[in-house]
Regions:
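Conserved ATP-binding/catalytic core of the eukaryotic-like protein kinase fold
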Residues: 1-241
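Positively charged, low-complexity intrinsically disordered regions
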Residues: 95, 100, 149, 344, ...
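C-terminal lobe helix-coil module of Hanks-type protein kinase domains
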Residues: 153-156, 190-338, 342-356
Length: 363
């Protein structure tokens, strides 16, 4: 019998990711009349709970992300605090991040993933990004959201074949630009756009360059901008001529070469203007290559790739079943009252590092 840890109205089960500033748990929430829901609960680590700047960023993440309701973006349910410990409750995705999938597929077969599948995944990400980029406030004014950290760790694929963008932690709405000190680099170096490196004002095209890097790496099975140091990596992004993906993987068709290189144009004016433009080209390629790749195909691929992991996850979930069965029968016997402090909860949690499907952003 495994016992979860009470935390406010939630029961924390396995810790599914931990970074330098926050940790993410699989958690369960209960309501009246048998209502219950699994969530991913992202909580600031106790040692930085007093860091006002990070707390502001954490709150900004929730405020931006809660405005977004789209099939290809992880849904935020709640921002709150328990005993001064801030947390965000969000949609729980049973699946893997793109980095883990990429590494597993490469180890399994040693060959790059099918270009059709990659085009399908990137097209779904384009849909989510386009929605975020075009989001307007209640008065109908564009909010100007730029994700700023589009990378394989921030893209999840569920075992059902759903593709989701996570972690708007470094996203900034343009009307909040006063919060951003000019020239501060945020995001992962190897996935930054040239204008991001230079500390220039960003628009949606910066995210498309970052997505272009992800696209290229999936197509070739190799990292694109990896230098001997962070400085070298940034120099590569600014100066390196990028050969077409087909030069590294002959399976990549010409149409995909063109889409990939257009997203990676150093000059923003030569890049796709909107994610919807890139999506249109990807869809045209997919529809002209029958049989069309579907969500079911993606689900099948993922379930095959992570068959053993899925079985282990089922066992972990089953270990909590007796506790939750008892709780459902007799809720009064489980009054949470003395919620353990966030530090105690952290120390007592089993740390499951079997996957990192909810990323830590700046952690």
């Amino acid at each position: 019998l495994k016992k979860p840890i009470p935390f406010g109205e939630y029961y924390l089960m396995d810790r599914i990711a931990v970074g330098g500033m926050a940790e993410v748990f699989k958690a369960k929430a209960f309501g009246s009349d048998g209502f219950e829901k699994d969530v991913a609960l992202k909580r600031i680590l106790p040692n930085i709970a007093e860091d006002a700047e990070f707390i502001d960023m954490f709150i900004d993440e929730a405020k931006i992300a809660v405005k977004l309701s789209h099939a290809n973006i992880v849904q935020i349910f709640k921002l709150d605090q328990v005993e001064g410990s801030y947390f965000i409750a969000m949609e729980y995705i049973q699946g893997r991040d793109l980095r883990t999938i990429f590494d597993r597929a490469r180890r399994k077969d040693g060959i790059p993933i099918d270009p059709k599948m990659i085009a399908y995944v990137i097209a779904r990400i384009c849909e989510g990004l386009d929605y975020a980029h075009r989001k307007r406030d209640e008065q109908g004014n564009p909010i100007g959201i730029v994700h700023r950290d589009v990378s394989p760790q921030n893209i999840l694929i569920s075992y059902e074949g759903d593709v989701k963008i996570i972690d708007f932690g470094v996203a900034k709405a343009q009307n909040k630009m006063s919060r951003t000190q000019a020239g501060i680099l945020k995001g992962k170096f190897a996935y930054m756009s040239p204008e991001q490196i230079q500390g220039l004002q960003l628009d949606q095209r910066s995210d498309l360059f970052s997505l272009g890097i992800v696209f290229y790496e999936l197509l070739t099975g190799q990292r694109l901008f990896v230098g001997e140091s962070d400085f070298h990596t940034l120099e590569m992004i600014r100066n390196m001529d990028v050969p077409p993906p087909s030069s590294k993987n002959p399976q990549v068709p010409k149409a995909i070469d063109e889409i990939s290189l257009k997203a990676l144009a150093r000059n923003v004016d030569q890049r796709y203007t909107y994610a919807s433009d890139m999506h249109e080209d990807l869809q045209r390629y997919l529809y002209s290559n029958q049989p069309i790749f579907t969500r079911q195909n993606l689900s099948q691929f993922l379930r095959e790739c992570f068959k053993e992991d899925l079985e282990k996850e089922k066992l972990r979930t089953a270990a909590y079943k007796p506790f939750f069965d008892e709780l459902r029968k007799n809720p009064a016997a489980f009054e949470q009252g003395d919620t353990p402090s966030s530090q105690a909860a952290s120390m007592n949690m089993p740390q499951q590092q079997f996957h990192q499907h909810h990323n830590m952003g700046s952690g």
